[in-house]
Amino acid sequence: NDLPTVGSPYVNENFTEGEVFYNEKSLGVYLYRHNAFNDEVEVVKPGDESVKYIKDEQGNFVPAEGESSSLATIKEIVLKDKETGRSLSLTTITNEDGALRNAYLYELASGQNYTLYYQNRVGFKEGVRAVNSMVRTTPNRFTHFQDFYIRKNNEEIAYFFSGKKKDLSTVLKKEDLESAEAVIGGQKLKTKSEEDLIILIEELNRN
């Protein structure tokens, strides 16, 4: 449709620098951006003279439409953001509905027992044109959501975590539940907070 669109399918519309690793071996620095709606990572090799660049609305030079390629969708590839140091990789997940699939996850904390990730998930709602003057036209809208996933490090799958304390029993090992309760109570952690979840997982990785 030709209605205006609010929001973006991208985590960040601008291309930023990230180092790409294959089986922990560096393949070099690339410009990348993550289309979280399609769950696709677009990459461009800096200095590639065949790539056409255009000026965006902010005056930045960015690769023209169709000039980027997709990062290979294999689990051995990890992309590390040069600015934040945060890793992005393809991981097998069970989502909120229990369905098994692969998705790009951002690593928040990692250690000997658990890895904590978040997924930047994007929903799209089509706008509606006003049929009369009593009703307002609503634009198309992209909305971003943050979902947490926890992987036991002896398993391949990262499990969806709702953020509710009672649901920790579905993502943690039985023997760690008591320790988790003690950490949450002792440090007054909120399990829906990214910062507090990082503290919890780092504590559980000390055991």
Enumerate the language-model features and the residues they cover.
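Sec-dependent signal peptide cleavage junction
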Residues: N1-Y10
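Short, hydrophobic/aromatic-rich segments at coil-to-beta transitions
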Residues: N12-E19, Y114
